[in-house]
Amino acid sequence: MDINMTRIYLASRSPRRAELLHQIGVAFVIIPSDIDESVYNAELAEDYVLRLARGKAQSCCARLPALDMPVLAADTTVCVDGKILGKPESDTEACAMLASMSGRWHEVHTAIAVASRDGTEVALSTTRVKMAALSRDVIAAYVSTGEPRDKAGAYGIQGLGGTLIERIEGSYSGVMGLPLFETAKLLRNCGVAIPGTQD
C-alpha cells in the first residue's frame, strides 16, 4: 500500500494518547466517541478492551460519511485477580484499587483499533506491572493529588504514579494508553506515514 496519508481521526480525549501520537509525528483531529463502556457478565479483560476499541472506532466512522482519514481508537483497563479495574468513581474507590495492587503484579491491557474504508484492524498490548508495597498513608497522599481520577486502575505511570511502580514487563506506552509499536504498525497498514519508520 502507498504510504501517503499524514493525518488521522483520534477517537479519544485522552491527553496521554495525544501526547504519544505527537511523539511519533502523527497529526490528528479529535472526534470523541460515545459508547456504552459497561463490562459484560464474565467478560475477560482482553475481550473487553478489544470490544470497546473496535466499538469506539466504528462509532466515529458512522459519524464520518466520507471517512477521508483513518480513525484510531483505544481502550485501556487494569486487571488484578481477574477483576477489571476501570477509572475510579471516587477517592475511596481509588484507594481500594491501589490497595488491591499493593506489593503485587497486575496486568494492563490496551487495545487499539484503526478503521478505514477497507475495514477495521485491531491489536492488543498486555503488560505486566509490579506495584510497590504501599502503606495507607502513601495511598492516601497519592489519591489526594487528584492524579488517579481519570486513570484506569487509579494510577498514571507517566506521572507521580510512576513512583509507585517497581518494574514492568511489556510496553510502557501501552500502560500509558497507546502502545506505539502496535499503533504504528496498524496505521502504516492503512496508509498513514510514520516519520522515520518503515515496514
UniProtKB/Swiss-Prot annotation:
Its cofactor is a divalent metal cation. Its EC number is 3.6.1.9. Keywords: Cytoplasm, Hydrolase, Nucleotide metabolism. One of its GO terms (molecular function) is UTP diphosphatase activity. It is found in: Cytoplasm. GO terms for biological process: nucleotide metabolic process. It holds the Pfam family Maf. GO terms for cellular component: cytoplasm. It catalyses: dTTP + H2O = dTMP + diphosphate + H(+); UTP + H2O = UMP + diphosphate + H(+). The record marks R16, T76, Q158 as: Important for substrate specificity. The active site is at D75 (proton acceptor). Nucleoside triphosphate pyrophosphatase that hydrolyzes dTTP and UTP. May have a dual role in cell division arrest and in preventing the incorporation of modified nucleotides into cellular nucleic acids. NCBIfam families: maf. Belongs to the Maf family. YhdE subfamily. HAMAP family: Maf. This is dTTP/UTP pyrophosphatase. It comes from Methylobacillus flagellatus (strain ATCC 51484 / DSM 6875 / VKM B-1610 / KT).
